[in-house]
Amino acid sequence: MARITVEDCLKVIPNRFNMTLAATVRARQISVGSTPMIDAGRDKPIVIALRELAQKKYNENILNTIR
């Protein structure tokens, strides 16, 4: 598995705080049953969410689901 860095995720969502919130929202979606958009393996939901974000599978618009 490739190592995930904050810098990879910040390329998609430049604001560190919004990036954290977006990954948290996506991880919650995965933990309650949403299908991962990548090969999840045995990773935890937050790791899956960060990998998805680094691969540009979602963006900051996910924050609109909580507002």
Curated annotation (Swiss-Prot):
Keywords: DNA-directed RNA polymerase, Nucleotidyltransferase, Transcription, Transferase. GO terms for molecular function: DNA binding; DNA-directed RNA polymerase activity. GO terms for cellular component: DNA-directed RNA polymerase complex. Its EC number is 2.7.7.6. GO terms for biological process: DNA-templated transcription. The keyword RNA-binding does not apply. The keyword Transcription applies. InterPro entries: DNA-dir_RNA_pol_omega, Pol_omega/Rpo6/RPB6, RPB6/omega-like_sf. It comes from the Bacteria. It catalyses: RNA(n) + a ribonucleoside 5'-triphosphate = RNA(n+1) + diphosphate. Promotes RNA polymerase assembly. Latches the N- and C-terminal regions of the beta' subunit thereby facilitating its interaction with the beta and alpha subunits. The RNAP catalytic core consists of 2 alpha, 1 beta, 1 beta' and 1 omega subunit. When a sigma factor is associated with the core the holoenzyme is formed, which can initiate transcription. Belongs to the RNA polymerase subunit omega family. NCBIfam families: rpoZ. This is DNA-directed RNA polymerase subunit omega. It comes from Nitrosomonas eutropha (strain DSM 101675 / C91 / Nm57).
